[in-house]
UniProtKB/Swiss-Prot annotation:
Pathway(s) this gene product operates in, as recorded in its UniProt entry: Glycan metabolism; L-arabinan degradation
Function recorded in the entry: Endo-1,5-alpha-L-arabinanase involved in degradation of pectin. Its preferred substrate is linear 1,5-alpha-L-arabinan.
InterPro entries in the cross-refs: GH43_arabinanases, Glyco_hydro_43, Glyco_hydro_43_endo_a_Ara-ase, Glyco_hydro_beta-prop_sf
Organism of provenance: Neosartorya fischeri (strain ATCC 1020 / DSM 3700 / CBS 544.65 / FGSC A1164 / JCM 1740 / NRRL 181 / WB 181)
Official protein name in the record: Probable arabinan endo-1,5-alpha-L-arabinosidase A
Classification of source organism: Eukaryota, Fungi, Dikarya, Ascomycota, Pezizomycotina
Cellular location(s): Secreted
Keywords: Carbohydrate metabolism, Glycosidase, Hydrolase, Polysaccharide degradation, Secreted, Signal, Xylan degradation
MF terms in GO: arabinan endo-1,5-alpha-L-arabinosidase activity
């Protein structure tokens, strides 16, 4: 057996042992960090937003691609007057009252001087986006949270913004009826009291009678210069509740506000550090977990991260990929 064939077989066996399917296929522009996915109502075209290039975005006829880069959502940066306004992170996309909303983060790495902003478009065409600045969800060193990693959730017409990264981890803020601004104060819905509180990137998805709170846990970035200890790299976890606003627990019954979280996807085979996830209902494939990851046969740099996706099986009551 050739060396390359041996590596391929070993990678497949590793994936089977851990029980994770390998990422679905991707063609075209597949380098991505913190992806966010939506289909346009008018024609079914897929749009994928990501960190970098003042919120880069691409389109495709399917989740597999071929993905074509369109450009930047906000080529002039954000109107929010904070450091990082020209380096926007972690987009989240939703359709609200017939208008496409892209929420984005303004911050710098390791800082709590952060804000969640909003850009809107009725078409998602290039150069059609209007920046509305801050949603009012902001943080400073006086806050228990970091106002980045936005995720809007629509619970039957009532909107909630999930957000947060490290510090006291994941918070939720009720939004106004237009989902343009926070309507009242935020509260904690997930927290790991141990270590550096390495929880971020929340994404909420309802399936059946449960609300599932997905999040990324561990160290996200810089793997090419400083590899984390084994198991401390990014992975995707989940808790669930019968309410959108709290009481989330993992499969063992541990509260998500006390370190709970059941692993959905972690490093396996040549897949390393999956995270920055979302969940998307594909008309052909059903529920899809999408994320970024490192292919260890290509490289560990942040700019080499790839778009991954797997079908989700909810038959056990918990997401399995």
């Amino acid at each position: 057996m050739s060396a390359s064939a041996f590596v391929a077989v070993a990678s497949c066996l590793a994936a089977l042992v851990h029980g994770y399917a390998n990422p679905g296929s991707c063609s075209g522009a597949c380098n991505v960090h913190d992806p966010a996915l939506i289909r346009r109502q008018s024609d079914g075209k897929y749009f994928r937003f990501s960190t970098g290039n003042k919120i880069s975005y691409a389109s495709s006829s399917s989740i597999q691609g071929p993905w074509t880069v369109l450009g930047s959502v906000l080529p002039s940066g954000s109107s929010i007057n904070l450091d990082g306004k020209d380096d926007l992170w972690a987009p989240d996309v939703s359709l609200v009252n017939g208008v496409y909303h892209v929420y984005y983060s303004v911050s710098t790495f390791g800082s709590q001087s952060s804000a969640i902003g909003l850009a809107t478009s009725s078409t998602m065409d290039l150069n059609s986006w209007t920046d509305h600045g801050s949603t009012g969800i902001q943080s400073s060193s006086s806050k228990p949270y970091n106002a980045i990693d936005a995720n809007l959730f629509n619970d039957g017409g009532t909107y909630y913004m999930n957000f947060g990264s490290f510090w006291h981890d994941i918070y939720q803020a009720p939004m106004n009826s237009a989902a343009t601004a926070a309507a009242s104060s935020s509260y904690n819905i997930a927290y790991n009291p141990s270590g550096t509180h390495a929880v971020e990137g929340a994404f909420m998805y309802k399936y059946g009678s449960y609300y599932y709170l997905f999040f990324s846990a561990g160290i996200c970035c810089g793997y090419d210069t400083s590899r984390p200890a084994s198991g401390e790299e990014y992975k995707i976890k989940v808790c669930r509740s019968t309410s959108a606003t709290g009481n989330f627990v993992d499969a063992s019954g541990v509260a998500c506000t006390n370190g709970g979280g059941t692993v959905v996807l972690e490093s396996h085979g040549t897949v390393y550090g999956p995270g920055g996830q979302g969940v998307f209902t594909d008309p052909s494939l059903g529920p899809i977990l999408y994320y970024h990851y490192v292919d260890t046969t290509i490289g560990y740099a942040d700019g080499q991260k790839l778009f991954g996706w797997n079908k989700i099986d909810f038959s056990s009551g918990w997401p399995v990929v």
